[in-house]
Amino acid sequence: MSIHEELRAELREAMRSKDQRRLAALRQVESEAAVVKTAPGFSEPVDDAFYQRVIAAYVKKMQKARDEYAALGPRAQAMAEGLAFEVEYLGRWLPKKLDEAATRALVRGIIAELGVTGAQAAGRVTGQVLKQHKDAVDGALVNRLVRDELAAPQP
């Protein structure tokens, strides 16, 4: 079953069970997909990879909003919890990301492969890691780890 078919089935089930949180998240994903599909110049196939990109972009926006609401304190707690639910719920359709330890190992391997040192090489290393492992790593985490590794004294 494709991701689109799963989303449609989940949407029907959420309607039947009157689960407003799931229903809102699924409708928003469909809306985001429709915006992308109707954009001028759109010509890619509407497949699982398309839906994963749409969901990933939406989840990224919701994570940022969740963090901003969480920083506002108790008044915005309900909104932050709602967004956290959406992020967790929609995450099941996204590829799994490597954890920090595995990402650090990749970063160290690329640094050794390129033979670079110093903070000025951070962009080159980050670009290489993302080029080779784009769907498996979190870009912000890679950037932080690259800067940490290049700033650390080399043995």
How does the language model describe each region?
Residues 1-155:
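Charged, compositionally biased, marginally structured helical/coil segments
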